[in-house]
Amino acid sequence: MRPLQRSPYSSAHILDSLMPTAFPTSRLARSSRACCAAPLLAGVLLVGGCSHSTSSAAGSMAMAAPKADPRVGLRAGETDAGEAAWNLRLLSNTPASEKFKGVTNSDLSFFGPYAIQGNYNGFQVWDISNPRTPELKIGYLCPASQSDVSVYRNLLFVSGEGFGGRVDCGTQGVPDTVSTDRLRGIRIFDITDITNPKYLANVQTCRGSHTHTLVSDPKDPDNVYIYVSGSAPVRSPNELAGCSGLTPEEDPNSALFRIEVIKVPLAHPEQAAIVSSPRIFYDLAAPPSHGEAPQDVARAAKAAAEARARGGFTATIHGMEFVLPSRFVDPMLDSVVKGRGGSGAPTADDSTALRAALPDIIAKLVGSNIRTGPTQCHDITVYPAIGLAGGACGGYGLLLDISDVANPKRLGAVSDSNFSFWHSATFNNDGTKLLFTDEWGGGGQPRCR
């Protein structure tokens, strides 16, 4: 998910901008709250996910932002929600193909007249030669959240992070806790024939790839590089040798507090491999924070009480009780059933057993109560022409020196207690400012107040 926000639903949105700008920070070079702790560049702009500069109803065009927030009172809906935009005009809204309906989209990349739309079920390729009538060229079914996509020449790179993604793109998932069938990392496709992508190879990583960023090195035209940001738990070393979830103090080879750098030989992309794992988060303290707003605490408590009354499952995380969704609970209930040698629907005893085990399960997923700085980035934006990158890394915004592309180094870091989750970063054209966005509540549970 990037600074240019796309609908989280399964349709292709084509928008026309009234104020076109040439952005040097593309996907190859990635396209007001409390004051930050320290500036990264000449000026650092912090923009929250609920910025009030959006304006005017969808379909109308205005050069100046209106004073009233037009989002107030918009109707809800999955595909027919009310819309508000400023200096953007919606040209088309094309439903997803059948295998991608109701599944979350992630990112867009471009190849000639085509838009490649990442989706948790794989990717779709749209011919947008006429943006008013996009034409689906292919829907490539290959599940693995979140399928962040990037293109370099004839190569398509796709992120995989979910535990159910398979190296063979199968849809049956991976039921085993340790399996060589699981894909968590980067998939590489040859899209010379856009209607028939060829799956060339994959590069497995310890934490998978939530997002990735392509980086070209002016000094190395024979290769392209990929910065991988993985935010999932560390996989078992029995599944991928060398993976360790211990802290760097306990294990210098820890998969935490680092990114992965993949080198892709353009003549032989199937030989792509990790060449470094820079610890760009080393020695960062826990960012400042404050508690949830009273209305959020009350709302969470009410939802949890109602869920418990219905027989639902809840968990306490950092002092607040949350309702656990069925997509989280159902696989664990199935495991309880299989663990006792049973089959079919879970029984009341199975539910009781899971409730007893949940506190330990959640504790392992969330980690200890000891707060640290970030252990990964959500996204990295690069500007190779000036040798800099911006990292939106959960609790911090980072400025990186990428003059040595394979070995990025941290130049500075800022934090802000009024930022919930540093989500994306974008440079201005002359590289003197870096814009960060905040993902408040998470992509699936957005908040705006």
Regions flagged by a language model, labelled:
Residues A12-H13, G173:
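N-terminal targeting/docking segments
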Residues C36-G48:
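Bacterial N-terminal signal peptides
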Residues M1, I14, M19, V44-V47:
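Short hydrophobic transmembrane-like helices used for membrane targeting/insertion
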Residues S7, S11-A12, L18-P39:
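Bacterial N-terminal signal peptides that target proteins for export
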Residues C50-R449:
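Feature marking well-ordered beta-strand scaffolds used for ligand recognition
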Residues M1-Q5, A12, S51, A267:
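Intrinsically disordered, low-complexity cationic segments
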Residues L4-S11, L46-V47, A64:
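A subset of signal/propeptide-processing and intrinsically disordered low-complexity segments
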